[in-house]
Amino acid sequence: MTCSVIPTLTEAASPVAMAAAPDHRRSVPRRFLRPPKPWNPTVGLFLCGYLLAGLTIWGWFVGGWPLPLLVATGFLALHLQGTVIHDACHRAAHPHRFWNAFMGHGAAMLLGFSYPVFTRVHLEHHAHVNDPEKDPDHTVSTFGPLWLIAPRFFYHEYFFFRRRLWRRYELLEWGIARGLFVVIVVTAAQQGFLPFVFNCWFAPALLVGVTLGLFFDYLPHRPFNERNRWRNARIYPGKTMNWLIMGQNYHLVHHLWPSIPWFHYKPAYEAVKPLLDVKGSPQRLGIYESCDDLLNFLYDVFLGIRSHRRSRSRLRNLVRIVPSRWACRQLLHVLHRTAVTPLPRRS
């Protein structure tokens, strides 16, 4: 069996299967679309995240905790806030608009993000999934190796200003958030606790960036060529994974109905699974199903730069340093085969 590193297409349901399958439901039940209660699991994540951040600070300055434990508590604090800011930008963190925004800004501060940037850029992602020009997360996922995905989130800031996405006072909010970040770092340098900032904030933030990039951006949307709303993200069901990554293994449910809070993804999926089956929605991880899938994943782990034109890869200039013609041909073959060609939106 021969294997090639090519983006695999999701198999859509055949017309015969779609006609034969019972379609008793056209959308998710309304109960999942209602605003969350004032005290809900997302509020718990927000409070637990700040509690863990406080324990990390205490453990460094007072408790003398070992560094691995401090990195772990810092990582968990930021990991929880990743879900908080994500739900807040969809107004699904709290029913009251003020507290929803408060939680979003609070989560962003711990993560080193800007809440207006995250919100506007993420909504652009939802509007243009897998569009090479308009989806900012598409660039994050396809312009480098997975192990370097965290630094590519800075592209969101560039995208925010290039597209002039801010509204009303959001530019002021960005300035305050970034000013506060600079003040913290400068104060840390002057007062001698910069090692704490690097070890217990920046290092966990880097780890969380890889986690968010993998489970929020890369895995849900690979192989990055589907733009149909029923197939532009995937689901890989699992109870344990559901809690570890707080529902992002049901990412397609989130894209279809963004107002559903993370703790309802799983029951919402179970309610609409027959509909998703009819629509041909991908419901597997899609990495180990074939040799092509595995090779694509390994390519993305170590290199991950994908062109959108098979004859003009972003890595084509590497051919100049390859010593032999045979090696040049093999490299060009790989670069051409790894190109991503997104399908039309209604395909």
For each feature predicted by the language model, list its residue ranges.
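Juxtamembrane helix-capping/reentrant segments at transmembrane boundaries
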Residues: A93-F113, D131-P145, R227-M241
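Non-catalytic, topology-defining segments of multipass membrane proteins
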Residues: M1-A77, A108-A203, W262-S347
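Transmembrane alpha-helical segments that form the membrane-embedded catalytic/substrate-channel core
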Residues: L76-I85, S114, F118, A203-R227
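Long helical/loop segments within the catalytic core of UDP-sugar-dependent glycosyltransferases
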Residues: L76, P237-Q248
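Histidine-centered catalytic micro-motifs
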Residues: Q81-R91, F118-N130, D217-P223, L244-I260
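Membrane-helix boundary/juxtamembrane motif in polytopic membrane proteins
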Residues: L172, F198-F202, N225-I235
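Long, highly hydrophobic alpha-helical transmembrane signal-anchor segments
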Residues: F61-A107
